[in-house]
């Protein structure tokens, strides 16, 4: 039952966010307004920006993780050198 509620909650949040963003005064400048993107990717990105736990204006602050090159293992140099070059790159 909780799985069915998640899409409904996301849709409600998207609608609320769109309502909040569009509620400002119309601009009276001579510059063109940026056209609003309505694709699913844009909506998802807008929702993520809205929900990001950040209080500064520089962007989201992500906590550091302990992921390094040893987490998944390093590439072996021999395997990299044996690969064929990509055919779509001009040489």
UniProtKB/Swiss-Prot annotation:
Subcellular location: Secreted
Cleaved signal peptide residues: 1-22
Single Gene Ontology MF annotation: receptor ligand activity
Modified residues (Tyrosine amide): 72
SMART domains assigned to the protein according to its UniProt record, in alphabetical order: CALCITONIN
Transmembrane segment boundaries: none
Removed propeptide positions: 23-33, 78-91
Gene Ontology CC: extracellular space
UniProt keyword terms in alphabetical order: Amidation, Amyloid, Cleavage on pair of basic residues, Disulfide bond, Hormone, Secreted, Signal
Disulphide bonds in the chain: 37-42
Domain of life: Eukaryota
Subunit structure, as described in the record: Can form homodimers. Interacts with IDE and INS. Interaction with INS inhibits homodimerization and fibril formation.
Protein name per its UniProtKB record: Islet amyloid polypeptide
